[in-house]
Amino acid sequence: MNNIDRDLTIEKYREGYQKYGYSPKSLGWDKGRQKIRFEILLSFFECAGKSILDIGCGFGDINQTLSQKTSNAYSYFGIDLVDELINEGRSRYQSDHIRFITADFLEYSFTEKFDIIVASGIFNHKFISEDNDKFVEKVLKKAFSLCTEGVAFDFLSDKVDYCHSHTYHNSPERILGLAYKLSRNICLRNDYMPFEFSIFIGKDDHFNPADAIFNVYKKRISKLS
């Protein structure tokens, strides 16, 4: 993200936090649906015992869902541009398996990989000078290079009845096309909210030509039987 849009983004969320404090409203969510988004993002992967990177983590509230799903058997690393949000997250989620850092995801040099990488809401703000489509592509590529199992991101859909001047709505078809450049193991969900969707990109897209079924899918099914 360039300096202009980075500064504007920081200012936007800093002002929201000063106005609303610890509240989804500070992050632009105001309809009580944040928990649904978190549950959807974590639905594609088995999270127990896994390392999770949360891009644009805000307060890190996805930890509530992770804790419930895994009985606290996970490690978490949240990264966000805004100091105030990170500090709030640190004060609320104090555990040895939870870390936070204030940094730009695209600029930060990671020294580790993560099993699962998630992001909620980071593509929804319309930039002033940065190209939103290129930003999405850069984040997808870097995240996929850093994960070992897969990524899960959500978006505002362009299949809407209206849109605000400050929001950016992505085409599900375009995002699906970007995903297929990275893997064949893809899932797109638009079955939980009419104007939002999530993309899941699995790292392992290997399969046996004899049955043409993804190996990871067979492992998942075998655990259920």
Stretches found by the model and what they are:
Residues 32-48:
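Conserved alpha-helix/loop element of class I SAM-dependent methyltransferases that forms part
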